[in-house]
Curated annotation (Swiss-Prot):
UniProt note on tissues of expression: Expressed in the intestine, spermatheca and nervous system. Expressed in the hypoderm. Expressed in structures of the excretory system. Not expressed in the male gonad.
Organism: Caenorhabditis elegans
Swiss-Prot/TrEMBL induction comment: By endoplasmic reticulum stress.
Signal sequence, start to end: 1-17
Effect of residue 75 to L: In dma1; results in up-regulation of ER stress response protein hsp-4 in the intestine and pharyngeal epithelium. Elevated expression of hsp-4 is suppressed in xbp-1 or ire-1 RNAi-mediated knockdown animals
Main location: secreted
Pfam families attached to this UniProt entry: ARMET_C, ARMET_N
Biological role: Inhibits endoplasmic reticulum (ER) stress response. Retained in the ER under normal conditions and is up-regulated and secreted by the ER in response to ER stress and hypoxia. Following secretion by the ER, directly binds to 3-O-sulfogalactosylceramide, a lipid sulfatide in the outer cell membrane of target cells. Sulfatide binding promotes its cellular uptake by endocytosis, and is required for its role in alleviating ER stress under ER stress conditions. Has a neuroprotective role, ensuring survival of dopaminergic neurons during normal growth.
Stored InterPro entries: ARMET-like, ARMET_C, ARMET_N, SAP_dom_sf
One of the record's GO cellular component terms: extracellular space
Name used for this protein in its record: Mesencephalic astrocyte-derived neurotrophic factor homolog
Transmembrane as UniProt keyword: no
Domain of life: Eukaryota
Phenotype upon loss of function: Animals are viable, and despite a delay in growth rate, appear healthy and have a normal lifespan. No defects in the axon formation or guidance of dopaminergic, GABAergic or serotinergic neurons. However, there is an age-dependent decline in the number of viable dopaminergic neurons under normal growth conditions. Up-regulation of ER stress response protein hsp-4 in the intestine, hypodermis and spermatheca. RNAi-mediated knockdown results in up-regulation of hsp-4 in the intestine and pharyngeal epithelium.
Amino acid sequence: MSRLVLLISLVIVVASAAAPQCEVCKKVLDDVMAKVPAGDKSKPDAIGKVIREHCETTRNKENKFCFYIGALPESATSIMNEVTKPLSWSMPTEKVCLEKLKGKDAQICELKYDKPLDWKTIDLKKMRVKELKNILGEWGEVCKGCTEKAELIKRIEELKPKYVKEEL
């Protein structure tokens, strides 16, 4: 009986360790810290400025993360101090995300990147209209006047060479 409990506990620990936690948070903060000049890495105000500048160009999940921490003008609340101060102390981004931000707003660590589509096997005709619109949205494109599924598929096929990198 105790072996069974131990085995189940081990499986749960391994499964939770395999799933990346706070992946969007870590990536955004890593990108931001790479942009911060070496002389400003210990200044919370300078880090905050770089975060806000970086967040102006983000889309999708990264933009949602920026909204949650208050780095966007339209954000309702701001927890930027919970981000900038620990980063100025050289705290690792993973620790900032898991220990500081997750406690303030659990939604931050629930953000996950969408799995990339396998363009070699995907059948656009079998996808729902909402999924097709999401593909265009991820690319930052819109299909004005598209009311039919076939029109969305046509637009995706037109833009596919621009956004989908074919592997050799």
